[in-house]
Amino acid sequence: MKKKSFFLLGVLCTVGFFSCTKNMRHVKDENVDLTEVQSSIFETKSPVSTFFDPTGLISASQHGVLDTIQKGFSFTEGPAVDKNGNVFFTDQPNDKIYKWTAATGQITTFLTGTGRSNGMAFDKDGYLIACADMHGELWKIAPDGSHTVLVNNYNGKLLNGPNDVWINPTNGGIYITDPIFPRGYWDASDPRKQNWEPTHSEQAATGKGGHVYYLAPGSNTLVRVTTMAAWNADIWPNGITGTPDGKKLYVNNWTYDGTGQIKAFDINSNGTLSNMQILVNNLNFCDGMSLDERGNIYVSGGPGLNAYDKNGNKILTIPGGGGTNNVFAGQNNKLLFMTSPDRVTSVKMHVKGVEKF
């Protein structure tokens, strides 16, 4: 009986291996056209180390594995969810925005020629607000793919490079982070350019460091809202999100030396910020963030994703997924959709994301 069992097991494993190999054949080609390709073709279960989830945020049906929706990208970012739970995300080096449809699991190309969009979010009218890094602009993209430029400067100077965006659901005001990640494709001859000094301490001394900006509803002028004395302009503000009541803003900063933080601010009635507090300390490679219905903060960065409660306690770790950004999506708003350099992944959750509309 043992020999027969082992023989049968070997046959099944062999069949399974070639089946998986067949399903994954397209993603080995870096030049594959992902347009109109069913994500179910690529969807696999990726073994990862055990999730840290002491409070049961992840659905029991996930069985401790990370779902890979699709591979073969260059650098995915900016996942934004629409009213139907669909996710739009960028492949920044390839200057494309893709759409994942919640009802079918299909991934299609939404837009080519995106201004190298990075962080994105939908407004209440269904327009996609995108941080277009190519020329330091903030775009408003219509459902048909056409766009208008909302802003392209601060006080007449180029932005460093809009990175991520959050829209206050109570009034439509827009917050963006503007860290200093000098890009080789920026036009150094532009007379509006800021002085990108060699060191961040010099940038801080001249007031040209990373900041957070606010665009009020109906305005075309950015307001710098990180003007408090406690703000250190010698940092890279990166991920940004806020509470559904529009009263609290969270901003993290990207570092590689363990000095990263998640900061919390009170949002004033005029959109300015006050009462800056440090929620979490000693972080690395912080990137995009989202919130769930309990107020927990999900932070992408480095090799995975971590979540923290309102008091800054770590309550979740998902290794291997969500290295750049994350958003709650799906038809029931209980799918954690994560972007990483070469792939998009997901985890079914027990909790819902905050309602954005």
Task: Describe the residue ranges of each PLM region.
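Positively charged n-region of N-terminal signal peptides that target proteins for export
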Residues: M1-K4
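Sec-dependent N-terminal signal peptides
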Residues: F6-T14
